[in-house]
A protein has these predicted regions:
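Conserved alpha/beta-hydrolase "acid-adjacent" motif
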Residues: 350-356
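Short beta-strand element of the alpha/beta-hydrolase
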Residues: 121-131
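Conserved alpha/beta-hydrolase
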Residues: 147-164
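Short beta-strand/loop motif that positions the catalytic acidic residue
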Residues: 337, 343-345, 349
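N-terminal cap/lid segment of alpha/beta-hydrolase-fold proteins
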Residues: 29, 83-119
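Accessory cap/linker subdomain of secreted extracellular hydrolases
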Residues: 225-333
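The serine-hydrolase catalytic nucleophile loop
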Residues: 131-145, 159, 355
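Alpha/beta-hydrolase active-site loop
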Residues: 170-190
């Protein structure tokens, strides 16, 4: 299935929105500060989304610039409008918003369908699977509004145990895939006769979940942002290696760390019964070396900081409640996905190191899978650009330019590279 056309849906949507704007004689709209309203606010050729941020609000421009609403912010809220740079008034765009509840595996989940006002039979519809954060996504993140602002209908829902949804928070991927399938059925029901193609997008941990759900959900395509094609154990080991290499350690220390992560993996999948003696031995062997205290990974750092007795008796409650299924093998899952896939990688991702994932994706393409792979340089997890200090710490600055365009264009079957500085792999 070819998903390249000549003009991106994101660009086409902005041109269409700008068509009725009289640039020669702009209408002056008085601005009075007021309470922020979640949604999309449009200028002639750009837009900004307003979402909730804890007790406050956050803005995100269509090019990825973002910040908190507050004193001195670039964006101020008014009734049905926002003021940008204290001089430009952008009006709220009309959207059809439908709140709903649906059931998955006996649990009530909260969802929201956001559609452009003129959504019709050719409008793409996507459902979003978010990452591991214990945060409901309804009205809280920019992604749904970035899609809707580009003419794509989008269904977002709060994962079980988060936001408005019931149930217990989980990182059991098959269970979360079942929830995604249920969300897909609900999205299609609500948008009946007002959508064309249907896709799933997963971000971070959602990149493990979307492929599990793709066939049952009836997806025409899938998109993954900063996900992994390694399992949870491999992710942990990759993170540990990256941490130590960034700290300046070489292959000798990496080999020692590999001994450690092999043992922590055995402990994790066995419920802390297989490897306790080996853990004690390695803690004694390497515990006084400088690199040992730097190990974090996904879970290895916590295990290494515990005694074997404590681990065997008490486990790790913060992990044990997650109901993790350690058996999922992403390559096996992806071999069963028979629709086009988009993978967008952050080159300098510390949470999801990309080297192995890229290698695996290229192997899948070699097996005949329809994959488009884009990598954005100088970005970290979440497609964030950053400033890095001399100590290696990073301050996240903005979502990289054209990332959101790429996602929406994929949904609209209208990819048109290049996307800023991204590399097509």
């Amino acid at each position: 299935m070819q998903r390249f056309l000549t003009f991106g849906v994101a660009a086409a949507w902005l041109v269409g929105c700008a068509a009725g704007v009289d640039r020669a004689e702009p209408v002056a709209i008085p601005f009075a500060p007021g309470a922020c309203e979640v949604g999309v606010y449009q200028s002639a050729d750009s837009f900004v989304t307003i979402t909730r941020r804890g007790e406050g609000m956050r803005y995100t421009f269509n090019d990825g610039r973002t910040g908190n609403i507050g004193d001195g912010a670039q964006v101020e809220c008014g009734e049905g409008v926002v003021q940008v740079d204290k001089s430009h008034i952008w009006q709220k765009r009309a959207m059809r918003v439908t709140n709903t509840e649906f059931e998955s595996l006996g649990v009530r989940l909260a969802g929201q369908l956001i559609e452009p006002a003129e959504a019709g039979p050719n409008t793409p519809l996507v459902v979003l699977a978010h990452g591991s954060e214990e945060l409901g996504w309804i009205e809280a993140v920019s992604y749904p509004y970035q899609f809707a602002g580009r003419g794509v209908s989008v269904f977002v829902y709060d994962k079980r145990g988060t936001g408005r949804s019931e149930g217990s928070y989980s990182q059991n991927f098959p269970q979360l895939a079942d929830d995604l399938v249920a969300a897909s059925f609900e999205a299609k029901r609500l948008a009946a006769d007002r959508f064309g193609s249907f896709g799933l997008f997963g971000f971070s941990q959602g990149g493990w979940i979307v492929p599990l759900a793709a066939e049952r959900a009836g997806a025409d395509y899938i998109g993954i942002g900063y996900g992994l094609v390694v399992d949870i154990l491999e992710e942990d080991a990759s993170q540990v290696e990256l941490e130590l290499r960034e700290a300046g350690y070489g292959d000798d220390v990496i080999a020692k760390a590999k001994e450690m992560t092999d043992v922590t993996a055995r402990l994790a999948i066995s419920g802390y019964s297989d490897g306790l003696e080996d853990l004690s031995a390695l803690q004694t062997k390497y515990g006084d070396e400088d690199w040992f205290s730097l190990v974090r990974g996904g879970f290895s750092g916590i295990i290494l900081g515990m005694s074997a007795d404590d681990l065997g008796q008490n486990g790790i409650p913060m992990f044990d409640r997650l109901n993790i299924d350690w058996s999922i093998k992403p390559m096996d899952v992806l071999r069963d996905v028979n629709v086009p896939q988009l993978w967008v990688l952050a080159q300098n991702d510390r949470e999801a190191p990309v080297s192995k994932t890229l290698e695996q994706l290229l192997a899948l393409r070699g097996e005949g899978k329809d994959l488009k792979i884009f990598m954005f340089p100088d970005t970290d997890h979440g497609m964030w650009e950053y400033q890095q200090g001399s100590d290696g710490s990073r301050i996240l600055t903005r979502v990289t330019d054209r990332y959101y365009d790429l996602l929406a264009d994929w949904a609209g079957a209208s990819l048109q590279p290049p996307y800023a500085m991204s590399e097509v792999k």
